[in-house]
């Protein structure tokens, strides 16, 4: 059994995960090499792709989200609204040429990758996941009303 087979064997949609990796490799060959060297992150990316075609597409379109996820995926606490507002401000600075509604959508999707992964890996309770989604919505709403 090769590495890919062992990583996808317990996923709900092995075919979707495999197709995701093929598409990611075609579009981002150099990033794929880096991803292949980090088995934990590769496993997380395949897991997200297997559970959600939306997240698979998000990662393919925004491969840098993986490296952000690598830094954030070990956090075990709920991020509060103020932390998310700060993170949104940093995201907005690095994406200053994007229309606000697109910026908010991209930020939300990036954060949902992290939150959804915590849920899939059972690193948080349903109450914590719900709280984080609520905090994320509050942060985006507050920022948009400024």
Spans of features found by a protein language model:
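Non-catalytic regulatory/linker segments of enzymes
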Residues: 1-146
